Regions:
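N-terminal Rossmann-like NAD(P)+-binding domain of SDR-like oxidoreductases, especially those catalyzing
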Residues: 1-95
Length: 95
């Protein structure tokens, strides 16, 4: 087993928040996270991206990716995402 995997318990997925996950880099990162055994959770305000990119990533990866259309400056909305998921890491691609 590779040391890159943190997903050690069957049926348990380490959830990773991906800000800007509908952009080019974020959506491709989601595919790689899933391939490595992680569960991406995406937040994006779609100001310079399209949700379609994330939908394509889901199709490529063969998995659903939770998505929240919020701005990362919205503390209440972001707190709600953290209350719904056990986020263990954050990858910040929002710009």
């Amino acid at each position: 087993m590779s040391g890159a995997y943190l997903n050690l318990v069957e049926d348990y997925f380490v959830e990773v928040l991906v800000t800007g996950g509908c952009g080019y880099i974020g959506s491709h990162t989601c595919i790689e996270l899933i391939a490595a055994g992680y569960q991406p959770v995406v937040v994006d305000n779609l100001c310079n991206s399209k949700q379609m990119a994330l939908q394509r990533s889901e199709k490529i990866a063969g998995a659903n990716i939770p998505f929240y259309e919020i701005d990362i400056g919205d503390k209440a909305a972001l707190a709600d995402v953290f209350s719904r998921h056990k986020i263990e890491a954050v990858l910040h691609f929002a710009g």
